[in-house]
């Protein structure tokens, strides 16, 4: 896709560049504005987006272990996703059978091709699909639909030479209903140009009254950019059950403008056409789409890292619960804690990211290496334990230790060391619990409350 190609490079440059953080942020925001405006996104929307990004930068602090640059890209990812529809996940599988979809759109949008792509999409999902050709104004429309139907093995209903579009649509739907088709797609006329929305909507109303579809889908060509706003908003007002398909996303630089314009109306973008082939129609997911624009690998890495930090925070909460007497610490908890730490990066990197630790040079390299090696061994040991052993380490005797050491490729001494570490944690927790009770007792004597 030509859409926002240079943003991927901008993300990479931002994450790996050597300029100061503030300068890098300023440069990236300029690049973002330039890219969005050249993709025909409405200027007001662009500046509203970048203002939100700046506002969040001012008010939000990155979680512990997350670098500022990574957190900035996460904010950009969130706000760009909102620009294109946020967390809206279109419902593509119908909740009833039979299900009638009526396609409308102006001429030249690729509506008939889209009808074929849609039929292929649902056929692949295992539905019995029928196509109705009710575009009576374009001479080759029915012929094109029949060719597509033949290519994908889907029956097509049409009446060559007949000019009554409403009648054709009605008879086609009735025929397929009698044949127990599960999804019926009706291709209607696209004889009106942009700016003639009223006539298009009037025709849509007449066919709608005749066939009572379950869904009306407007097909829009991505190359019209932000002009899609007027068409989509009028369509959205006229048809509350309406969804939208944006075609030709691969062949224009204005796709971003079309997507953001449609999203601004509140209409649901269901699919986007990403090429000419019959299978090049994809369900539109704003977050997945933005991840691809920004560079899927970079975004996934950052999101995964943030998720791991959240997992680690959950582990910390679990420890707090154990100390307060609400829970019990098991080796399974120790395992989850180590996994969360491991995924957040090497120990040296974690020490760098910890706020307030400016003594990195004082932590010997060989000590860090020993820590990494110990972590690796302990994970291997716990992977060789049964669920029963993880949940109740007190049952691990010498013969079990031998089996665990053999299964994990470690020494019995390593297994003993892990068990000793676990027992030390247990003793520490008991001590903390006792202290907590003593403090509460003391506060009680003075009529205070524990916090």
Swiss-Prot record:
GO terms for molecular function: 7S RNA binding; ATP hydrolysis activity; GTP binding; GTPase activity. Keywords: Cytoplasm, GTP-binding, Hydrolase, Nucleotide-binding, Ribonucleoprotein, RNA-binding, Signal recognition particle. GO terms for cellular component: signal recognition particle. CDD domains: SRP54_G. It comes from the Archaea. GO terms for biological process: SRP-dependent cotranslational protein targeting to membrane. It catalyses: GTP + H2O = GDP + phosphate + H(+). Involved in targeting and insertion of nascent membrane proteins into the cytoplasmic membrane. Binds to the hydrophobic signal sequence of the ribosome-nascent chain (RNC) as it emerges from the ribosomes. The SRP-RNC complex is then targeted to the cytoplasmic membrane where it interacts with the SRP receptor FtsY. Composed of three domains: the N-terminal N domain, which is responsible for interactions with the ribosome, the central G domain, which binds GTP, and the C-terminal M domain, which binds the RNA and the signal sequence of the RNC. This is Signal recognition particle 54 kDa protein. It comes from Acidianus ambivalens.
């Amino acid at each position: 896709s030509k859409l926002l190609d240079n943003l991927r490079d901008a993300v990479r440059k931002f994450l790996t560049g050597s300029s100061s953080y503030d300068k890098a942020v300023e440069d990236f925001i300029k690049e973002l504005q330039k890219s969005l405006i050249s993709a025909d996104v409405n200027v007001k929307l662009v500046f509203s987006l970048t203002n939100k990004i700046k506002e969040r930068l001012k008010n939000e602090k990155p979680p512990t272990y997350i670098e500022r640059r990574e957190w900035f890209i996460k904010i950009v990812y969130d706000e760009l996703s909102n620009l294109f529809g946020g967390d809206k996940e279109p419902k593509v599988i119908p909740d009833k059978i039979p299900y009638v979809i009526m396609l409308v759109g102006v001429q030249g949008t690729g509506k008939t091709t889209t009808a074929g792509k849609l039929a292929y999409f649902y056929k692949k999902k295992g539905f019995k699909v029928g196509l109705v050709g009710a575009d009576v104004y374009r001479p080759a429309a029915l012929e094109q639909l029949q060719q597509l139907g033949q290519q994908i093995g889907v029956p097509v209903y049409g009446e060559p030479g007949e000019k009554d579009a409403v009648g054709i649509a009605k008879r086609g739907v009735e025929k397929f209903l009698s044949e127990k088709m599960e999804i019926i797609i009706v291709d209607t006329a696209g004889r009106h140009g942009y700016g003639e929305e009223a006539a298009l909507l009037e025709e849509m109303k007449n066919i709608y009254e005749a066939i009572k579809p379950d869904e009306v889908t407007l097909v829009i060509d991505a190359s019209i950019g932000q002009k899609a706003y007027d068409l989509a908003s009028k369509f959205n007002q006229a048809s509350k059950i309406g969804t939208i398909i944006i075609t030709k996303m691969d062949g224009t630089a204005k796709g971003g403008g079309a997507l953001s314009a449609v999203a601004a109306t509140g209409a649901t973008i269901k699919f986007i056409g990403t090429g000419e082939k019959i299978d090049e129609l994809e369900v539109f997911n704003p977050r997945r789409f933005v991840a691809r624009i920004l560079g899927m690998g970079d975004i996934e890495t950052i999101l995964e890292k943030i998720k791991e930090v959240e997992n680690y925070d959950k582990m910390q909460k679990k420890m707090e619960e154990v100390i307060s007497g609400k829970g019990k610490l098991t080796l399974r908890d120790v395992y989850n804690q180590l996994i969360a730490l491991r995924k957040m990066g090497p120990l040296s990197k974690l020490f760098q990211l910890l706020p307030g630790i400016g003594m990195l040079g004082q932590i010997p390299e060989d000590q860090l290496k020993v820590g990494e090696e110990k972590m690796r061994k302990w994970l291997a040991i716990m992977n060789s334990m049964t669920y029963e052993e993880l949940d109740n380490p007190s049952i691990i005797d010498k013969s079990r230790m031998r089996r665990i050491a053999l299964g994990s490729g470690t020494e019995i001494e390593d297994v003993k060391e892990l068990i000793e570490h676990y027992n030390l944690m247990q003793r520490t927790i008991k001590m903390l619990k006792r202290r907590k009770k003593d403090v509460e007792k003391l506060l009680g004597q003075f009529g205070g409350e524990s916090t």
